[in-house]
Amino acid sequence: MRTDDANATAAERVQDGANFESADRRVLFGQHFAAISGAGPLVGPILAAQMGYLPSVLWIILGVIFAGAVQDMLMLWISAKRRGRSFGQMATDEMGKVGVLIISVFLVVVTAIAMAFLALVAIKAMASSPWAVFSLGMTIPIALIMGCYERFLRPGRVIETTILGFVLLVLAIVGGGMIAANPVLAPIFTLNAKQLVVALVLYSFAAAALPHWLLVTPRDYLSTLMKIGTLASRSNGPTFSGNLFPFLFITIACGALSGFHGAVSSGLTPKAIEKENQIRMIGYGSMLVESFTAIIALIAAVTISQGVYFSMNMSPSQIEATAGSAYSASASPEQNAAAAVSRMDVQNIEGQRMRVEWQSDGTVYTGAEALDAAAHDVGEETLVSRTGGATTFAIGMANFLRSYLGGEESMAFWYHFAIMFEALFILTTVDNGTRVARYQIGDLLGNVRRLRKFADPTWRPGNLITTFVATALWGTMLYMGVSDANGGINAMVPIFGISNQLLSAGCFMLVTVCVVKAGLGQYAWIPVVPLVWDVAVTFTADFEKIFDPQLGYFATASSLRASIDSGQLEGEALATAYASLSNAYLDGVLSVFFLVMMAAFLAVGLKTIVATVRARAYGDHLTSQEPFLESNWFAPSGLIATRLERKVQREFEQRHARRAELG
């Protein structure tokens, strides 16, 4: 990468106090980690646990080393060398306007789907929970206090700011429990899903529009304090018979490789980085920590009872289909779930048939009683069909922590702590995703001659307009999703994983183009190897979801059409069938759209590489890389500064303070 700390970064070159503003490397590490590490490394591995923990662990470890962390670091590198330009801007500069039109449209749509999906997971966890609403709401003023404290009161005192934020965060969590137990205050903080959508949209607009240092950076750093340090243990897990390739790699997603990370690493984090040598620590290091989080999530899934796991992760329709003749409309959800599990042909590692069981207060409960006991222990009415992975992670984490901290009585506390833990990180990703979408919309509009000013990230009116458009896109899908179980974002959840991984292919292609054009072709294999693997996985998965007679969206639509035409459905069943039919066609069309768009982008990239090689025109001067500019700043390169770096840092700060006093 040939990083050089003597070269001024985008934060130093522009320094507009809003988008281009340097951040302490430790804070930026936390902010970047929180931005990329939303629900993905938690939910994906939990769902992939059904396919077996060994292949999941192998892909998380190998995938992050050779693909995920490589992508994040190299995208951060090429953007930092280009004044913090976004994915779309770099595609324009290196591959032409065709490239930017393709990737900007692709990225805006995928980001909107991702933000709506992640927000839906958070809202499901927060709805009707005054504890979660109060605690999460308090992170906003806490972040504002941290931002102002570090910028105005005690500049550069990161440890002091960290302690302040951590203490206030713990008080917010404890206060949330007190609020939930108060009969007067609890109703005030008890919000339904629609109310939470409105609150979340308003917050995200403000977070994306305000200066980065004021709210997003300290809040993301605050989120990191909650995520790092989770304990781990060993256990046996559930098994699942099915095709690991390609869907295991799609399901785990962010735990090993994610295209969304490339968007955050380009145009967002590079605008705040102090020195080029911090790129490896922030880009590669943050992704390594995220993969560790994915391992913890996988452990959380496999430490709970298999029967409880499947009862939580089967939808009502799946329970009915699996239970067969044992299903009863008059029975409780717990009874039907237990009946469905008893009919599943799944065995544990000892070869025993799976059953629903739960241990509480020294008693081992089985069947429906086990599900009732588990729900009672965490303070929920039911745990059946709590799909999405969030509840599974919270149960697993609480079940583990109660063994070491607090015993049986602490189960509910740790469960709600885990729910807030997840929701806080999800909302952090939504904050940054909105900002990423804003940049991409600006890039897209900037290609129109009369709207070129929108491509300037320092233009305030353009920032507000593009932020509104970005928020409206995912906010509308989210509101429709909470209003209709079959509409809005619910209809597009199935395509999220594949589209996100397709975006990774675009990231690797752009990096390859930049590497070749810079005359570093001998190192092109570094992005090319994961590019080839990612294309093989995602294109195979997309083809199967489009054309497979059993898994394909259009095959599902044909089956639903046949059921509707048979005349045997009526009432709610008929309405559900029509909604599912529309969703199947929508997912099929979008899958084709994403596949064609990414294939076209890869073709444009390949054409650019071939043209460069044939012309034998190489060098940084032929790329959009910024020319060298002597830096007047100093900052340590690693997370922990050396003794010499601390000495130079003190001298630099003293000199800077004297200059400020002299005006």
Each model region followed by its residue ranges:
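Loop-to-transmembrane helix boundary motifs in multi-pass membrane proteins
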Residues: K97-A112, G285-F292, T387-G389, E408-A418, ...
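Membrane-interface "cap" regions at the ends of multi-pass membrane proteins
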Residues: M1-L42, T224
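Selective recognition of specific alpha-helical transmembrane segments in multi-pass small-molecule
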Residues: L107, A112-A114, V167, L171-A172, ...
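Extracellular loop-to-transmembrane helix junctions
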Residues: A48-S79, G88, W131-A143, G147, ...
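Flexible loop linkers connecting adjacent transmembrane helices
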Residues: M1-E21, L47, I61, V70-G99, ...
